[in-house]
Amino acid sequence: MFWKFDLNTTSHVDKLLDKEHVTLQELMDEDDILQECKAQNQKLLDFLCRQQCMEELVSLITQDPPLDMEEKVRFKYPNTACELLTCDVPQISDRLGGDESLLSLLYDFLDHEPPLNPLLASFFSKTIGNLIARKTEQVITFLKKKDKFISLVLKHIGTSALMDLLLRLVSCVEPAGLRQDVLHWLNEEKVIQRLVELIHPSQDEDRQSNASQTLCDIVRLGRDQGSQLQEALEPDPLLTALESQDCVEQLLKNMFDGDRTESCLVSGTQVLLTLLETRRVGTEGLVDSFSQGLERSYAVSSSVLHGIEPRLKDFHQLLLNPPKKKAILTTIGVLEEPLGNARLHGARLMAALLHTNTPSINQELCRLNTMDLLLDLFFKYTWNNFLHFQVELCIAAILSHAAREERTEASGSESRVEPPHENGNRSLETPQPAASLPDNTMVTHLFQKCCLVQRILEAWEANDHTQAAGGMRRGNMGHLTRIANAVVQNLERGPVQTHISEVIRGLPADCRGRWESFVEETLTETNRRNTVDLVSTHHLHSSSEDEDIEGAFPNELSLQQAFSDYQIQQMTANFVDQFGFNDEEFADQDDNINAPFDRIAEINFNIDADEDSPSAALFEACCSDRIQPFDDDEDEDIWEDSDTRCAARVMARPRFGAPHASESCSKNGPERGGQDGKASLEAHRDAPGAGAPPAPGKKEAPPVEGDSEGAMWTAVFDEPANSTPTAPGVVRDVGSSVWAAGTSAPEEKGWAKFTDFQPFCCSESGPRCSSPVDTECSHAEGSRSQGPEKASQASYFAVSPASPCAWNVCVTRKAPLLASDSSSSGGSHSEDGDQKAASAMDAVSRGPGREAPPLPTVARTEEAVGRVGCADSRLLSPACPAPKEVTAAPAVAVPPEATVAITTALSKAGPAIPTPAVSSALAVAVPLGPIMAVTAAPAMVATLGTVTKDGKTDAPPEGAALNGPV
């Protein structure tokens, strides 16, 4: 929005630079001068890099501003000058670092007498530090030429900014070779020894504190950088000097030989604690996932331990007689004799020394009875948790290292204080073998001389009495509980168990009984209370079924998964509510695999026709054969193309009045029926009586039971009234007559010619059928021009055994015309193509609310009601009676490309036959007359009084009559 409304202000720096006599102060008054400088405005950089401007910038950060200036703007220009000099612009850095006159002007800041202005000192340190990082060689060369540089820095070490500058020289010099040269230069200047000298009671507290902090940082930086280097370089000379025994002894001498001040004792002890920092070993003797070099770099040098050991008595005296402190007011009252920072650091040093597990130091501490003194302080200063923690660490170190000694003794190996250091120049402390140690000296001392068990019991009982009297619970009870638990754990298990058990058994009887009662009752109850979770860990019920998350705080991936599950659940619910179907529309739930196809849509219609139509007999004669069920077991092969030999039979009435039965010649066409269709083909070829129509009243072959699921898609045509009905879902074999290639003598054939017929009510320009049967049967129509008989141009009518309705969404189409002459009929007729035929369209419905599924196969001949296009024909047996009723099961599919379902040639003088009754599923009847075309559409059929899917009755198309030509 800021840029949208063009609120950005234009910089005035360029305008000022266009002036002839612009000053640096005028430019620094602009707020965007830093942005322009970092953007490397060349005109501005050229102005700033002038000698006069550079000198003015350096003077601003090294000279105190006038005192008469207002305080809030007094250091404005020095701050801006420092930012300009350290903005990491190469042009400015090169100009400042490459000019010794500017460096000398900058260096003169150190010649001021202490104390330095802290703010100006920070500007100076930042500028020099930036030059050390950017122009290392030039700056280091310049500083080496200054003999008093280290002395001046140490002179102003009380200013923290100068301490930072010294650390930059130690850590920020690159590459490693140049850094090593700088370290050697600093070591030659005796930086470590001079810093140690600053830790003296005669020095200011700030100088002592900063000198101590500098030494601690040098130790840590030296160890860290030494461990991070892959190649084995020479050791850090500064770290080696600081870890030397002479340096440690000098430090301790400065601490204790003069007037003992708390600041000196604390500062010196901090350096010793840093030198004693070690890599802690895990409870199972495993180190954490750091490199081996890092472990070695944190090892304690034996020279440090040798330097500290003679001064243990001084630290013991420090714990007894610390520097005097005044009484202080605390939240629990006035503390007359505070513990003091010096004694606290002394306790920290004892814990660090015990952690090294040096036998000589352990023996000296036992001789001095230092642990007993620490326990006295523990129970005296009940509210000093810093002290309580250090005493707990001391006891834990004694017990854990005693166990380590036992493990070493059992393995017969020698226990070392530390692994070898990577430097190789510092020898490591090699303690005596654990086997030669006198019976775990520190453990025995802790339980016998220090009376740890008795002190725990006495303090616990005293606290119970205090609380019973209405007093406060003591502040050290938490640490006392942890100490007691450590004793019990080492008593119950571990290598030190035997030794502690002997010590406990050596206690007086009353004390031993109190301890056992304390462990079994009091301590157990306390631990039970302490282990109660402050926050309930009971997991709330989640809508997700994933119950594998056991942590109270699941990780990020688990949270994301739970949120995703929640979103999916909400989205699914909304989707079903908004875009789903109503349950009442699909009340029947089929277990069949094809059930989803039943729920799409359906077309239900009935056709009323004249009961005297003779077409019912011919329709029944063609449809009486049972249809092969769809085999669901071969779903994986339904899309594979294969060849099959199909035959179609059409019943027509030629011009001379004798009915003929014609069989189609074998043709190659696509079949998608799979293995089952091939087997059926072979069976029909081998069956006797091929090509013979079924005798009237004759019972068909025994039914073949199909798969229960496959039977759901079978098409059943009921037998005539005199035949035995068959249960739905059972398919009967109709013989192989329809599959056998007929070889009858050529006869004269008469073909129906529809050129004079009127088209159906709907044109072919309507929407194309979306049924899969349309696609499947397109191959059948294409095969008309591929056979050996070029004249077979008739449209096919196919009935699929698994199709409930092929015209579920298509509109009424024109009936394709069937034309034949002497050339196409093989010489059967010469000029008899004007014979008109009656065509009945088979339209099948699946029932209310259903739509035909996609058909995977091209219908076989036994499922076909009629198919035209064969050269051979035979006389139809006149004894075949006309059926009274035709019932079509919902499995007949009619390809839109071959819309002619049944072509029946009727004689104009033919007798009237009663019209068959209309079945609930389908009733197709052709009235008396030359022709009546029946077709199906989603909402219209070409018959009088047709019932559409919408449940409405549409009027017949114009020109249509019940008993007359269309």
UniProtKB/Swiss-Prot annotation:
Its main location: cytoplasm. Residues 408-424, 669-687 have a biased composition (Basic and acidic residues). It is found in: Cytoplasm. Residues 408-436, 657-707, 819-856 are annotated as: Disordered. It comes from the Eukaryota. GO terms for molecular function: protein phosphatase binding; protein phosphatase regulator activity. GO terms for cellular component: cytoplasmic ribonucleoprotein granule; cytosol; nucleus. It holds the Pfam family SAPS. One of its GO terms (biological process) is regulation of signal transduction. Keywords: Cytoplasm, Phosphoprotein. The modification Phosphoserine is found at S289, S771, S828. Ubiquitously expressed with strongest expression in the testis followed by liver, heart, kidney, brain and placenta. Belongs to the SAPS family. Protein phosphatase 6 (PP6) holoenzyme is proposed to be a heterotrimeric complex formed by the catalytic subunit, a SAPS domain-containing subunit (PP6R) and an ankyrin repeat-domain containing regulatory subunit (ARS). Interacts with PPP6C and NFKBIE. Interacts with ANKRD28. Regulatory subunit of protein phosphatase 6 (PP6). May function as a scaffolding PP6 subunit. Involved in the PP6-mediated dephosphorylation of NFKBIE opposing its degradation in response to TNF-alpha. This is Serine/threonine-protein phosphatase 6 regulatory subunit 2. It comes from Homo sapiens (Human).
